[in-house]
């Protein structure tokens, strides 16, 4: 009986892997490797095969106590069902956006949602400033408030061509098309060579 159940579970798992491969830029072999990586990541604090916000923040900044705006925003975008945990399917689908073959538009939309911390459908100056400060603090870097304000002002001067004090998705897409380096961190090169980078997860 146990053997039959085990085979059924393995068959279902293989179906899930095949489905994820068909929906993303990853091959079945690469999804297998990502599954091994996911299991390793989810076991950092407990073995429940889910990435909770606490685990996610621990992986990103090695600290579960300190609030991290960027970690919260990234977690929220991975957590597509908004149920407080990232499952393997959500993990793969979100990583797919960072794949080198993913479209610039998908990357731009993801980055836009990252900066739209209040989820209003547009980016406000205060949101950009908060994200800059958060990233600087996590990197243990310091910039004066006047320099940060100057960066924010310059960004809006370039991006907000409608001059209404906010950046909507259309303006954002125009901005990143003009300054493609803005999306540099939206591509993870090794996702195109997963089996070589993570050979220990091959089965």
Curated annotation (Swiss-Prot):
Q: Where is this site: Involved in dimerization?
A: 139
- Tissue specificity remark: Expressed in green tissues, but not in the roots.
Return the GO cellular component terms, semicolon-separated.
Answer: cytoplasm; nucleus
Q: Which family does it belong to?
A: Belongs to the calcineurin regulatory subunit family.
User: What job does the chain carry out?
Assistant: Acts as a calcium sensor. CBL proteins interact with CIPK serine-threonine protein kinases. Binding of a CBL protein to the regulatory NAF domain of a CIPK protein lead to the activation of the kinase in a calcium-dependent manner. May function as a positive regulator of salt or drought responses.
Q: How does it assemble?
A: Homodimer. Interacts with PP2CA, CIPK2, CIPK11, CIPK23 and CIPK24.
Among its keywords, does the record have Lipoprotein?
A: yes
In terms of PROSITE patterns, this protein maps to: EF_HAND_2
Q: At which residues does the record annotate a lipid attachment of kind N-myristoyl glycine?
A: 2
Q: How is it modified after translation?
A: Both N-myristoylation and calcium-mediated conformational changes are essential for its function.
Enumerate the subcellular locations listed in this protein's record, separating them with semicolons. Cytoplasm; Nucleus
Principal cellular location given in the protein's record: cytoplasm
Top-level taxon = Eukaryota
Q: Which UniProt keywords apply?
A: Cytoplasm, Lipoprotein, Myristate, Nucleus, Repeat
User: SMART domains attached here?
Assistant: EFh
List each copy of the EF-hand domain by range.
30-65, 66-101, 103-138, 147-182
The GO molecular function terms of this record are:
calcium ion binding; kinase binding
- Protein name as catalogued: Calcineurin B-like protein 5
- Do the record's keywords include Repressor? no
Tell me which InterPro entries the record gives.
Answer: CNBL1-10 (IPR045198), EF-hand-dom_pair (IPR011992), EF_hand_dom (IPR002048)
One Pfam family cited in the UniProt record for this chain: EF-hand_7
Q: Name one GO biological process term.
A: calcium-mediated signaling
